[in-house]
């Protein structure tokens, strides 16, 4: 699954489901997928992922 398709699919999931998937990815995969999302979505997920790792 390429990052464009993954970003589209993840964007359509409920937030908690999306976060479970995103936090399980490698940093490289995560960066590639976030880069394909809207800036707003990427920022939101990045903030929530960072908060969950504190």
Model-predicted regions and their roles:
Residues 1-54:
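Hydrophobic packing positions in regular secondary-structure scaffolds
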């Amino acid at each position: 699954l390429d990052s464009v398709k993954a970003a589209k699919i993840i964007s359509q999931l409920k937030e908690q489901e999306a976060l479970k998937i995103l936090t399980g990815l490698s940093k490289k995969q995560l960066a590639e997928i976030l880069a394909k999302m809207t800036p707003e979505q990427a920022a939101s997920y990045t903030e929530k992922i960072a908060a969950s790792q504190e």
